[in-house]
């Protein structure tokens, strides 16, 4: 069972496998700039999710 701060968490959807295409998403940089996965199109990427 996966927990977050001691509380159970339920995931939905299918788990990505190595080689799968990730859906586009966006995050905010420390400089408060919005960056999306599409901003890095054509470049090799490593996604580390914790």
Curated annotation (Swiss-Prot):
InterPro entries per record: Thioredoxin-like_sf, Tpx_Peroxidase_subfamily
Keyword presence, Oxidoreductase: yes
GO molecular function: thioredoxin-dependent peroxiredoxin activity
Top-level taxon of origin: Bacteria
Catalytic activity: a hydroperoxide + [thioredoxin]-dithiol = an alcohol + [thioredoxin]-disulfide + H2O
Statement: the UniProt record of this protein carries the keyword Oxidoreductase: yes
Family: Belongs to the peroxiredoxin family. Tpx subfamily.
Described purpose of this protein according to its UniProt entry: Thiol-specific peroxidase that catalyzes the reduction of hydrogen peroxide and organic hydroperoxides to water and alcohols, respectively. Plays a role in cell protection against oxidative stress by detoxifying peroxides.
Subunit structure: Homodimer.
The name this protein goes by in its record: Thiol peroxidase
Organism per entry: Streptococcus pneumoniae
